[in-house]
């Protein structure tokens, strides 16, 4: 995306890995560094997937809280559709304006959940997402590595439809993220999430600032 001047950072991992907490902390820390974090309409805010747009939030409810299980390809295509809307309406304009965007999940969740864990194939799921991505991939993807059993215990509360599928799915998802990390080593960083929140946050911030600095070098600044 040639007109892009911002930085896209995504946090990933199995359910209960702590990514939502770390995404919020990262936004706070980057903002404290004086960086223009989050969308201009909501400075400092994390963008979540599925969601981030009115259409995305509506489909999120179907995906995570619908009354019945969805066929794997239905699930994959709905995620791809909400992602295309997010890219068009939010990500490309905000990155073009030089914002630093922190996302709670993005394309790699589809690759790990639907591509690997659901058995649709990483290449097949990537292919259906590519038109909507319009060439956009993260500058940095942080995968918080946590034992899925610990993650499910951490998640707490009423589980969403995917969390309710239990440990077997989450173990396959964790394996899927490991495959994604090996597939895209230039942008995916595995960070041990089974530590104190503040210690993890230091590592997440360091990786993010490195990505911001690298992006600055790419735009000559």
Predicted features along the sequence, with ranges:
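Extreme N-terminal, non-catalytic leader segments
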Residues: 1-8, 36
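NTP-dependent small-molecule kinase module
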Residues: 2-3, 25-27, 149-221
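Hydrophobic anchor at the beta1->P-loop junction of P-loop NTPases
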Residues: 11
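Walker A (P-loop) phosphate-binding loop of P-loop NTPases
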Residues: 16
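Conserved lysine of the Walker
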Residues: 19
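Hydrophobic positions on the alpha1 helix immediately C-terminal to the Walker A/P-loop
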Residues: 22
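ATP-dependent small-molecule kinase phosphotransfer cores
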Residues: 35-133, 203, 207
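A glycine- and Lys/Arg-enriched "phosphate-lid" helix/loop adjacent to the NTP-binding pocket
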Residues: 105, 109-175
């Amino acid at each position: 995306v040639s007109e892009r001047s911002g930085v896209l950072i995504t946090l990933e991992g199995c359910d209960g890995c702590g990514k939502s907490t770390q995404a919020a902390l990262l936004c706070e820390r980057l903002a404290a560094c004086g960086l223009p974090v989050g969308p201009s309409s909501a400075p400092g805010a994390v963008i979540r997937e599925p969601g981030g747009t009115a259409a995305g939030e509506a489909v999120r409810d179907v995906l995570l809280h619908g009354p019945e299980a969805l066929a794997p390809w239905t699930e994959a295509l709905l995620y791809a559709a909400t992602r295309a809307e997010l890219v068009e309406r939010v990500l490309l304009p905000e990155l073009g304006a030089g914002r630093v965007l922190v996302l709670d999940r993005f394309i790699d969740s589809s690759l790990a959940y639907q591509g690997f864990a659901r058995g649709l194939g990483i290449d097949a799921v990537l292919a259906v997402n590519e038109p909507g991505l319009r060439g956009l991939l993260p500058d940095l993807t942080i995968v918080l590595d946590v034992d899925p059993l610990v993650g499910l215990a951490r998640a707490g509360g009423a589980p969403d439809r995917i969390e309710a599928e239990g440990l077997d799915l989450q173990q396959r998802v964790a394996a899927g993220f490991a495959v994604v990390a090996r597939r895209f080593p230039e942008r995916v960083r595995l960070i041990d999430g089974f530590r104190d929140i503040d210690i993890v946050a230091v590592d997440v911030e360091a990786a993010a600032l490195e990505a911001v600095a690298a992006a600055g070098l790419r735009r000559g600044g």
